[in-house]
Amino acid sequence: MPSYRLQLLIDPKDLPIVKTAGQRITLAKPVSAASPNVIWQSIDPFTSTEISWEEQYGIYCSTVAVSDGATITKMSETEIPAQDGSYYSFTPATVFNGPMSGGSPPVARGSYKAINDVPYSAYPVLTFGLTQTAMINQQPADRKPISATSVLATQSALMTPFTNIYVWLQSNFKSETIITQITGNHSVAKFGGAVDNITLKYDPNLGVFVSATPKGVLEHDSGLVQINAPLF
């Protein structure tokens, strides 16, 4: 199972400014879409922050509607790791049953499927998504949601996680918050394949984290990071 490490650096002279502004390091991951819709981790910044994780996921269900700024409260969830290439039934007892194979079409490896078998009379619509655990400066952040999608009774959600990590600073939202879009400048760290370790450093002139050496030397032209900032 692949494991990844992301190191985020902030210059000591910039850190007090970031903290005074109430900014937090924010991470998100896309699932079955071009951009993320849930804040995975919201982290109090330090001069060096290390995040590590494995490509293992769980599936959760919530009664919280998919709306901007809503905080996800999980009704039920599977263990991590859930089995990819399989499907899980969310039963009328509001628990997950699975994994199960087969189905038409079958679930591809690397994807996860949840079927909403709760009666419409009980819950007309529920929210499903994936969860993932990370270690932040050696402290566990367990089973945090990374995605959210509305699923009507009798319907299903097919979820395919990606390995890219979106990184930015913001002050409005905490972990497990649904967002309709990422506002402001952000970076995308491109993990996957042979890339399992990336170091980024905050560039206050661009307002984003850019590629850097482990010693903090900026590398603006690295192919490992996509910068989304108007001045770049």
PLM region spans:
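Intrinsically disordered, low-complexity segments enriched in small/polar residues
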Residues: 1-232
